[in-house]
Amino acid sequence: MKFSELWLREWVNPAIDSDALANQITMAGLEVDGVEPVAGSFNGVVVGEVVECAQHPNADKLRVTKVNVGGERLLDIVCGAPNCRQGLKVAVATIGAILPGDFKIKAAKLRGEPSEGMLCSFSELGISDDHSGIIELPADAPLGTDIREYLKLDDNTIEISVTPNRADCLGIIGVARDVAVLNKAPLQEPEMAPVTATISDTLLITVEAVDACPRYLGRVVKGINVNAPTPLWMKEKLRRCGIRSIDAVVDVTNYVLLELGQPMHAFDKDRIDGGIVVRMAKEGETVVLLDGSEATLNADTLVIADHHKALGIAGIFGGEHSGVNGETQNVLLECAYFNPLSITGRARRHGLHTDASHRYERGVDPALQYKTIERATRLLLDICGGDAGPIIDVSNEATLPKRATITLRRSKLDRLIGHHIADEQVSDILRRLGCEVTEGQDEWKAVAPTWRFDMEIEEDLVEEVARVYGYNNIPDEPIQAGLIMGTHREADLSLKRVKTMLNDKGYQEVITYSFVDPKVQQLIHPGAEALLLPNPISVEMSAMRLSLWSGLLATVVYNQNRQQNRVRIFETGLRFVPDTQANLGIRQDLMLAGVICGNRYDEHWNLAKETVDFYDLKGDLEAVLDLTGKLGDIQFKAEMNPALHPGQSAAIYLKDERIGFIGVVHPELERKLDLNGRTLVFELEWNKLADRIVPQAREISRFPANRRDIAVVVAENVPAADILSECKKVGVNQVVGVNLFDVYRGKGVAEGYKSLAISLILQDTNRTLEEEEIAATVAKCVEALKERFQASLRD
């Protein structure tokens, strides 16, 4: 939003300079992007009149003029501008004048004719880039008046960034309101008295889309002179706001747009067939716009139409057929309130961005239309003449926005600002903002003004009070809070400790999306029900994950595709499982999962290449589980998981409760996911492990330990873990260590059986064990194994 500082000061004129004004606007939340003078630095340029204008005797493109600047004599000035003519009021740089670029005017001869000055164009005075001709001033411009004073060139253009919530500041009136509030200054609105209708002409207006267009005002103005020149003061204001003058009718609608922030449109009334209809477009309907382009419309686009065709896209762009041209005599002025949702996105769909769409998308004051159409009518009649009919009002109060009533509590205000503002100041600020305020016990009820449709909740009022009070007036206060010592349970095992261990073992932590591809998830968890997102980022991210494996395996594939074949990664995060017993029907479990693949070690000249296997991952996992103090209660049991190899996987149990899985990815899944080589995964429900068993200190025996090795033959389907567990149970007082150190199948062992070599470490804390005691304990272990598993000692 760009505007003239002097135009703003016509509405409100605080006793501060330009820099202070710009800083104040910025601190109020409307960031000033730039302040620039409207003209270059010059002096000695005055208003003059061309009294005589004759052809230069020695040059075809030059003219010899006599110019009256209000002095004792006429000045002889040679001019080359094509629009120079007798009777024209012009800007004259007299001898001694200094123009932008330090260009000094001196008496000279041009092709033999004396020249005592220069007739200036806008570009020569640094006002604009227009160098097509000299400046043409109004006929009533007083001779000899300094041009800076006459055109009010001691002015600045101020450009601000208007945030989407402050659409009310997309007009001079909105910025002026804020400046008036900040300075406690009166707002001086220009006179906008209603225009008395001098004709009774109207036009039938029908609003079919009442939700999209709650209010539509129209007014017929007949007998205008569309070719009447736009006054220089209006052209200058438009120029300083970055708007090029086109013709009087368009200039008037642009002027009120900039002044009040309300878009308008003018139709050639004689080219409207039957009347105006505000409706939704028909699918595939076309309209030729004012720029000559053809737009093909969708059924959700609001259009202004007559009884046979669309005349334009509502709130965005008018149509060529009903546009005002040089032959127009009768116009229909349109001023409407369109629901922002009916305009949003439609302009971009057709590659358009107009001042009107910019404002309508953000919202305009629903109570501003009457004031705007009266203002535009008066300006149009003053410039183009003609007669105005009555205002045609088609409004639907039920669909117009309602003013919000908001309660502001003293406790909320003080808590969010961190500073106490006196009650009377709060009330005064709210009233200056345009709110209707009712004061209560430690609270205020405020009805937001129609132009502040961004005021909806209590926090909005807190923001407004702080903004107007001045952020710089809120003192810095150190935060005061009691120091509360956090409780620490020795039994709590932090994930940070687990992550550190995995890092030490060469794993890298990754974070993957909770949104996964439902097709991939079905491959990993066939038949499992997942939560599907109603509005996903993409189809490939439309399901909530049932485990962390989806993201981890995708990460492995990503790395393998980039020649990273040795991968060790882990992740902690939530899985989302549909569960009717859980809150909102979703159970969220904190999981710890990891993946390894590739070589066991980094490439080294002294190490043979060995691919990781089940026991590499199991060993790493046991190290993690050992941190919990529950490793002794952990069992790995053969159990089917559709994502894992049936012969190289296991379920992980904590006592009798399953808490996870470990194993090699199923070859079929490996193929479908494009994994390169054997890949191993694990996953644990971390919440079931986080409460660790605190280690108990115990005496270290001073007596020697004894090792005895036994080899027992058992059926192939007997888990080695059960054998070890049974040995520990039998020798609970004296067996301090049990370890499986060899598994043998082959000669001497019947098919379907295996030989397990087990070491038993026996030790007592009070005495040295006798050989008889050791032998008896070993015999008890062998007997227990024989009884439970039909084990036999291998010869």
Swiss-Prot record:
SUPFAM superfamilies the record matches: Anticodon-binding domain of PheRS (SSF54991), Class II aaRS and biotin synthetases (SSF55681), Nucleic acid-binding proteins (SSF50249), PheT/TilS domain (SSF56037), Putative DNA-binding domain (SSF46955)
A GO CC annotation given for this chain: phenylalanine-tRNA ligase complex
Principal place of residence: cytoplasm
Chemical reaction(s) catalysed: tRNA(Phe) + L-phenylalanine + ATP = L-phenylalanyl-tRNA(Phe) + AMP + diphosphate + H(+)
Cofactors that this protein relies on: Mg(2+)
Cofactor note: Binds 2 magnesium ions per tetramer.
Domain B5: 401-476
GO terms (BP aspect): phenylalanyl-tRNA aminoacylation
Matching CDD domains: PheRS_beta_core (cd00769), tRNA_bind_bactPheRS (cd02796)
Enzyme class of the recorded protein, top EC level: ligase
Record-level Gene Ontology MF annotations: ATP binding; magnesium ion binding; phenylalanine-tRNA ligase activity; tRNA binding
Protein's recorded name: Phenylalanine--tRNA ligase beta subunit
Gene: pheT
